Amino acid sequence: MEEEDESRGKTEESGEDRGDGPPDRDPALSPSAFILRAIQQAVGSSLQGDLPNDKDGSRCCGLQWRRCCRSPRSEPRSQESGGADMATVLDTAADSFLVELVSILDPPDTWVPSHLDLQPGESEDVLELVAEVRIGDRDPMPLPVPSLLPRLRAWRTGKTVSPQSHASRPACSRHLLTLGTGDGGPAPPPAPSSASSSPSPSPSSSSPSPPPPPPPPPPPALPAPRFDIYDPFHPTDEAYSPPPAPEQKYDPFEPTGSNPSSSAGTPSPEEEEEEEEEEEEEGLSQSISRISETLAGIYDDNSLSQDFPGDDSPHREPPPPQTLGAPGTPPQADSTRAEGAPRRRVFVVGPEAEACLEGKVSVEVVTTAGGPALPLPPLPPTDPEIEEGEIVQPEEEPRVAVSLFRAARPRQPPASVATLASVAAPAAPPASAPRAPEGDDFLSLHADSDGEGALQVDLGEPPAPPAADARWGGLDLRRKILTQRRERYRQRSASPGPPPARKKARRERQRSGDPAPPDSPTWEAKKHRSRERKLGSHSTARRRSRSRSRRRSRSRSADRRRGSHRSRSREKRRRRRRSASPPPAASSSSSSRRERHRGKRREGGKKKKKRSRSRAEKRSGDLEKLPAPVPPSGSDRDSRRRGAVPPSIQDLTDHDLFAIKRTITVGRPDKTEPRAPSPAPAVSPKREVLYDSEGLSADERGAKGDKDRRRSGAASSSSSSREKASRRKALDGDRGRDRDRSSKKTRPPKDSAPGSGALPKAPPSSGSSSSSSSCSSRKVKLQSKVAVLIREGVSSTTPAKDSSSSGLGSIGVKFSRDRESRSPFLKPDERAPAEGVKVAPGSTKPKKTKAKAKAGAKKAKGTKGKTKPSKTRKKVRSGGSSTASGGPGSLKKSKADSCSQAASAKGTEETSWSGEERTTKAPSTPPPKVAPPPPALTPDSQTVDSSCKTPEVSFLPEEASEDTGVRVGAEEEEEEEEEEEEEEEQQPATTTATSTAAAAPSTAPSAGSTAGDSGAEDGPAARASQLPTLPPPMPWNLPAGVDCTTSGVLALTALLFKMEEANLASRAKAQELIQATNQILSHRKPPSTLGVTPAPVPTSLGLPPGPSSYLLPGSLPIGGCGSTPPTPTGLVPASDKREGSSSSEGRGDTDKYLKKLHTQERAVEEVKLAIKPYYQKKDITKEEYKDILRKAVHKICHSKSGEINPVKVSNLVRAYVQRYRYFRKHGRKPGDPPGPPRPPKEPGPPDKGGPGLPLPPL
C-alpha cells in the first residue's frame, strides 16, 4: 500500500492522482471529497479528521500524506485523499474499505511515482515508497511506488504549491506541515504530527510543522505566517498551538491523541484541519481514549493506528484513525523535513492490530536523498495526537533525533518498516508492534519525545520489540518501550553529547534567531534522524517539532536574550536533572512537570518529559529543574485550577495534564535546549513512568504534553518566550515578567518538582538541585507574578502564616514587575543573567539590596512556596536542598537566585543561626552582596551568581562569610518585614512578601539546619554579598528603600494598582501573615535578638521600605521606623537599621518592630484604598499617586496616636489629592507648594489626621 507513503509525492498525487487513484472513490468527487465521503462512511467522527487527511492526503502537501498516506493511510490511497488512510479505512471499513482502497491503491500507481519530483533542496530523501497493502488476510498488494512518488513530486515540487494544500485545507495543513515541519525545520518535525495522520493529528502535525521554518509559504498562508513568525519567533507555533490547546479533548489516556491535533490544530491550516479532525476526533478522542486505554501500552499502535483501536472498537468507522497517518505522518515528516526527513516510513496497518482491521497496510517510505531516511513513525491519522505528542517533541525531537536518527535512519528496512506499519494497523495493543520493527523509527517516537534527545534514545531500543510490538499489550509495549527508552536514554545519557550538542546548537541557533536558516539545514539533518525516530513516533515528532518550533521561537527569542549562557546552564540543569531524576526530567511541561511530577511521577514523568522537552528548548534550564523533582500534587492541582499555574503531576488527571500542557507549552522549549544532551537519560525514565503510570505510551503522553504545550503554545509560547526572555534578559523586564508569569505558571510544577526533585536531587547534586530549584524557583517567581501572585498570595497567604513553610509557599505574590521596574536599577550583574532581574523582583526591595537578594532568595522561596505552598514548604522543609530549590526558583533573579540558593538554602539556614550576626553585618551587607561564589550553586546558579557577582566580593569574604549568613537570616527577616511592608503597600505583594519572609525565616532555620549552617554561611555569605552587590552602594535600608523607590516604587505602584483589588483579601491575609510573621520573628529573632533584631530594625527601615519606596523619591526612607536620614546614606543602613531597631526600641523588640511594620503595611493599604478612587478618576497621576501614598503612609506611620483611622486616612489622602490637584492646576510641583502645605499636613502625622499633610520628609 505504498499508498501515499510517498506522502509527498502523494500530495499532488493524492489530490490529482486521487482523482485517478480513487477510482473506487468516485474520482468525480475530488479525491478529498470522495475520501471524505468514504471516510465519513467509514469513520463518522474520524471523518472530519479523515477529510482533512483526505485533503491533506490528496492535496495536502505530502505532509499529511506523508503522515497519513505513508501510514496505513496510504493504503486507502483513494481514501488517503480522504484522510481515511488505509489504516483508518482498514480499521473501519476493513475489508470493504480495503478492497476499495486496494482498487484505489492499485490505480495510484501514478500516485507513487518511483521517483519524486523534488524541489531543489528537497532531496528525494522524501520517500521512496515501498508500500504494500494487505487487506484483511489478503496478500499484501504492493502499490506502485511511482504513482505515489509522482504525487510526492507534485507535493514536493508543489510542496508549497497550494494546489494540494489548497485542494483541501487539510492538504494545506499537510502542506504546511510538510513545509513547516520539513522545511520549518526541526519544529515541524511534525513528523510527530504524523500523529496528525488522522486529520486532526495532521493539523497537529501541521501545526508543529509550521513552526519549522519551512518557508514554503505557498502551501497555506498559515504555514507561511508560521514560518515567518515561527521562524523569527518560534512563538508562532505557540500562537498557533494555543488555539488547539482548547481542543485538548484527547482523553487523559491519550495525552497526545487529541491534544497534538488541537494544540497544533490551530496553528496552521493543518492545525485547523486538525481542529476539524479534532471535532471528528472528539469521537476519536473518546475512541482514542478507549484506544489509549486499550492500547495504553501500545503507544506505537496508537501512533500507527491510534484511532485504530478507536476505529476497531470506537472508531472503526474512522479508518483514518487507524491509518493513524503513520504513512501520512511520514509524509508530513518527510515532506516537512523533506530535506532531512526520514526517508523510510513503513506503516503496516493490518488485522494484526485488530481483527476489525482486516486490512494490513504496510507502507515503507524510503527516502533517497537527504541522507537520513528517517522512517516516520506511522502516526494515527485520526489520533495523531497520541502519537504526535506521544513522546516526540517536535522541536526537540528533530534536534535530538538528528544524530541518533541519522544512525538509525539506515535501520528502517522496508520490511521491518512494513512490519511496524502492520503492527500499527491493529488498533489493539498489537498495533504498536510495528514501531519496534521500525525500530528506530517507531522508537523514534519515544526517542523523539526526548526534549534533550531522550526520544532519540528510544529510537534505538524499540527495534528489539518490533516483532512483539503489535502484540505488546498497551502496558507491555509501554513498558518495553520505556525500558528501551531507558536504555536508550542511558545510552544517550552516556553519549548524549552528539545529539544534545546538535540539539543544543540547533536550539541555540534557533534561539539566536539564526535558527531558522541553520535550523532548517540542521533540522534537515536532524529531521532525518528525527524522522527516523519519528517514523516510530511521527505524531510525537510532529508535536515535538511543533513544540520545538515553539521552543525555538521562544528559545530563539529567549535564547537570544539569554544567550547560550542560559541555554548552557539550562542544559546543565537539565542534564543534572535528567541524571538525577531522569524519569521526571522528561516531564512534558516544566510546570506540569513539576506539579505533575509530584503527584504523578510516572504520569508526570511522561508529561514532564514532554513538557520538559517542549520547554527544554524553551527553558531547558527551568525544565531541567522541574523534571527531576516530583512536585506535590496539592499544589499542582491548585495551580491547574488557577489555570495560570500548572497543577502538580500527581494531582493532574490526563485532562488536567492536557490543560497544563496547554498552559505549560510555554516552558517546554527551554527544556529541550539545554536538556538535549543529558535529558535523554532522564527523559527515558520519566517517559517510562508516564508510560507506565498513565497507561499511555510515554510517547503518547509526551505527544500529549507537546500538544498541550502547543495548544497552550500561543499563550504558553508567548509566556515561554517571555519567560525565556526574562530568564535571558532582565532587559525583557516586562516581557520576562510576562514570561515569568507564564513560566511561573508553567514552572510552578517545575518548582515543585525541583522542590521534591531538588531535594532528592540535592543529595546527588546539591548544586544541581539548586540549579534546578533555582530554575523552578524562578519559574515560581514568574508564577508569583501579580496576577498569579495575587491569586496565589491571597489563597496561600494563610498557609504561609500557618507555618513558615506555609508562609513560604503561601504567598507567591512577589510582583515580577519589581524586577522589571528595578531592572534599570539592578546591577548589570544581577540583571545580566536576566535571572538577576528576577532577583530584583524576588527581592522586590532594592532597599536592602542584600536583603533584596536575600529577599529574592526568600521570595524566590516564598514566591515559589507561595506559588505552590505545599511544594515550597516541602522544599524548604526538605532543607537546604529545598531552599536551594527555592533559590533556583529565582534563577532569573540571578543574584536573588544565588542568594536564594545559597542564601535561601544557606541563607535560610543561616537565618536561624546567623540571624544574630546579621545585624552586625547589616551595615556591610551591601558590600557582601558581592559574594558571587555560591559554593553549592550549580553551574547554572553559579552562572547566575557570576552574573550577579559584583566587585564587592571583598566584603563578601569578610562579612559575607560570617555575617552574610547572619545577615541572610536577619536580612531575611528584615526583608520579610520590608517586603511585607512593600508588598503590603502593594497589598497582596506585601502579604506575600511577609508570608514569604516569615516562612522563609522560619523555614530557613529548618531548611538551613538541614542544609547545614556552615555551608549556608559560605554560600549565603557569597550570595548575600552578591545580592547586596545589586545596590551595594545603598545600605540595606537604602538599597531597599532607594531601589524600591527608584525601581521598586514604580513596580510597587504599578503593582499596587494591580493588587489593589486583592487589597482586601491581601489585607486580611496580611494581618494573618503579620501575626505569623510576628510569631516567627519573635521566635526566630529572640534567639538572635541582638543580631537579628538590628536586622529587623533595619527592616524597620524595611518597614519604611514599602513607604520608603514611595518616600525614597523624597530620599526619606520611610525610615519612619527610626531612620529617616539613612535612606540617602548608602552606608547609613547599618546605623539606620540600628536606628530602626532603636526606634523599634530594642533589637530584641521584634514585636515592636513588627508592630510598626504591620502598622505601616496597614497604613499603606488604607492609603491605597483612600487614594484609589482619585486615581481611578484620574484626579491624580501615577506619580502623584506614588507621592501621596508615600507621604500619607509616612505621616500615618509617624502620627502620634499611631492608630490608623480610615476616616483620618481618607481625609489625609483627600487633602493630598486636593493639594496636588491645586498644584497641578497652578503648574507648581506638589513638592514645592507642598512644602508649605506639608507643614499643615504634618500635624496630620500624629494620626495622619488632618487633611493629608505631605510630610516634608519625603
Curated annotation (Swiss-Prot):
Biased composition (Low complexity): 193-207, 414-426, 752-777, 795-806, 987-1019
Top-rank taxon, per record: Eukaryota
Pfam family, one: SCAF11-like_C
Region (Necessary for interaction with the CTD domain of POLR2A) residue spans: 1133-1258
Protein name (database record): Splicing factor, arginine/serine-rich 19
Keyword terms of this UniProt record: Isopeptide bond, mRNA processing, mRNA splicing, Nucleus, Phosphoprotein, Repeat, RNA-binding, Ubl conjugation
Compositional bias segments (type: Basic and acidic residues): 7-27, 228-237, 614-625, 698-711, 721-743, 815-833, 1135-1154
Compositional bias ranges of the Polar residues kind: 256-266, 940-949
Keyword Nucleotide-binding: no
Assigned GO CC terms: nucleus
Biological function: May function in pre-mRNA splicing.
Regions of compositional bias (Basic residues) in chain numbering: 480-491, 540-555, 562-579, 594-613, 845-877
Sequence positions bearing Phosphoserine: 241, 444, 449, 493, 495, 512, 520, 579, 581, 678, 684, 693, 697, 821, 823, 878, 885, 912, 914, 941
Region (Disordered) residue spans: 1-32, 159-345, 370-398, 410-1034, 1114-1154, 1223-1258
Subunit comment: Interacts with POLR2A.
Species: Rattus norvegicus (Rat)
Compositionally biased intervals (Acidic residues): 269-283, 384-395, 971-986
Phosphotyrosine carried by residues: 691
Family (UniProt): Belongs to the splicing factor SR family.
Localization terms from the record: Nucleus
GO process terms (BP): mRNA processing; RNA splicing; transcription by RNA polymerase II
Residue list for modification Phosphothreonine: 329, 665, 925, 938, 950
Chain intervals with Pro residues compositional bias: 208-223, 374-383, 924-937, 1246-1258
